[in-house]
Amino acid sequence: EKCEEKTTHDKKERMMRCPSCGNTMFPKISPAIIVAVTDDHNRLLVTKYAGRTKDQYALVAGFVEIGETLEECVQRELMEEVGIRVKDIRYYASQPWGFVGNLMVGFTAKLDGSDQIHLDETELGLARWLTPEEIPEIDDYSSLTREMIRRFKYGCL
């Protein structure tokens, strides 16, 4: 049972603790995935979000649903947003995202089957395959998205 005492920041962990009853509360974290998909022709699947003014390329991304593994989320988001299947899903890196407790988990994957894109126009304004030479220079390295696209462009993803 929880008491009504005001909680304080724990000195050892990122949590709140009640000094009276010892109850601990960890922050809620919302995991999301982002995936860099490549094909056998050395192309990267890039996207642009629908209804956004930023004219930068992005990658397929989305939040993990309850009861879903990260890898299942990668498969589902790709099928929902662009209608493709992938294999060889591999962890790349992660990044705390925003101030609301999101955690972006990056993956790489290989196209498995057709490269035909079936765009979900409610989510995306554009999705296409680009070679490294077709990707514009990236001077913003603040996000996992930009890092992954840049690393593909320079052959080190």
Give the ranges of each region predicted by the language model.
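Short functional micro-motifs and their immediate structural scaffolds
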Residues: 5-8, 26
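Active-site-adjacent beta-strand/loop module that shapes the phosphate/pyrophosphate-binding cleft
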Residues: 95-118
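N-terminal strand-loop-strand
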Residues: 12-59, 63, 85-86, 109-111
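The catalytic Nudix box helix
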Residues: 58-93, 107
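Nudix hydrolase/Nudix homology domain
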Residues: 1, 53-57, 121-157
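Generic recognition of flexible, low-complexity loop/linker segments
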Residues: 93-95, 132
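Cys/His-coordinated zinc-binding microdomains
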Residues: 1-4, 22
